[in-house]
Amino acid sequence: MKIYRSTLLHTPASPFAVPDALQTFSDGALAVGDTGTIAHLGTFTEVLAEVRAACPDAEVHDLRGGVLLPGFIDTHVHYPQVRVLGGLGMALLEWLDRNTLPEEARLADAAYARTIAGEFLHGLASHGTTTALVFGSHFAGAMDEFFAEAAARGLRVVAGQVVSDRLLRPELHTTPERAYAEGKALIERWHGQGRSLYAVTPRFSLSASEGILDACAALLTEFPDVRFTSHINENNQEIEVVRGLFPGARDYLDTYERAGLVTPRSVFAHNVHPNERELGVLAAQRCSVAHCPCSNSALGSGLFPLRRHLAAGVHVALGTDVGGGTGFSLLKEGLQAYFMQQLLGEEGAALSPAHLLYLATLAGAQALGLDGQVGDFTPGKQFDAVWLRPRAGSTLATVLAHAESEERTLAALFALGTGDDVERVWVGGGVVFAREAEA
């Protein structure tokens, strides 16, 4: 048994539903068993007494001087795009054509894909992300490299081969038959192995014909516990193209709905420009939306209508959208989400630091159906955590030293925190990133 002593902050419930959902311990502790399961949570004095009564030799890890949060959960991030981060000055479709698709084509080479997988997974872990819903590669071999590397590093990943059959580069296209066959083989090799799960992943309706969408639906039917993810309503130009490709569809969501792809296992990225029917269906079907505020801002896609999603009952979590976004940091995404709602004025949703933490942690676990395992520090869940410790003399260290409350501490972490403040990261009780090991 190990005891971790630190300032502890987590949201075991949604602040959108429970106003006092933020739970804080200024001198708190977690006791973690040998299997990585949290056994006790409370003040350090309480936890030490409980654990030492049964386990006198339990070791104490003193993490004071920093803040311990649940591991971040990224619900939309692209594995092949780590090297195209920073492509500013373009809207979505031009950015895809000029920056992204040429790079994605390079992952046909397995050795190159292996290198990219390592860079990508290091980017996640080094920014405190312990679980991610990952848009994969168009190549099955590249997905084998990805899952193998994720297993070696110990991260939790939900990922799948991306499938398309039109309007991209020809080498990225597949057929419905091949999409089904390769997807099935990948599911049988990787789904449920260790910490890996599979997500059926058509790129978006713009590049996926009805045949591709039907093949995806066949996989969801055959494997009832795999997940589904795709893009929706990101950019007005994209929406118009999809409307022309599916003249019989009521709207963008209907292109997926008609194929049977709108279910509680579905996570749709962006949804910046939904209509009321789409919001109603997403809520009724208990789908989730991955809100990617940095990407939406960088690509000029629009301001996310969070208040409308919440009013309709649609579940929302955060995604970084590497490489359309601006990096792997969910602290940055939380801050940008806050800015975006501020800019919307009366049409925006009022967000507190507790909301930002929830969106970056438990909300993602709920979107992925993993909230029984991760997302907060409730005893019985896995110890997935990030220890943030600012450098001595930094502005963040100064602010934290004078913070009047734990909520003020949390606000400062989102406002000022960066990847450089991530000191150590655990998944299932094991260290997956340590800053000192990078020195």
Swiss-Prot record:
Gene3D superfamilies: Metal-dependent hydrolases (3.20.20.140), Urease, subunit C, domain 1 (2.30.40.10). Zn(2+) binds at H76, H78, H231, D321. Its EC number is 3.5.4.3. It holds the Pfam family Amidohydro_1. GO terms for cellular component: cytosol. One of its GO terms (molecular function) is zinc ion binding. InterPro entries: Amidohydro-rel, Guanine_deaminase, Metal-dep_hydrolase_composite, Metal_Hydrolase, Metallo-dep_hydrolases. NCBIfam families: guan_deamin, PRK09228.1. Catalyzes the hydrolytic deamination of guanine, producing xanthine and ammonia. This is Probable guanine deaminase.
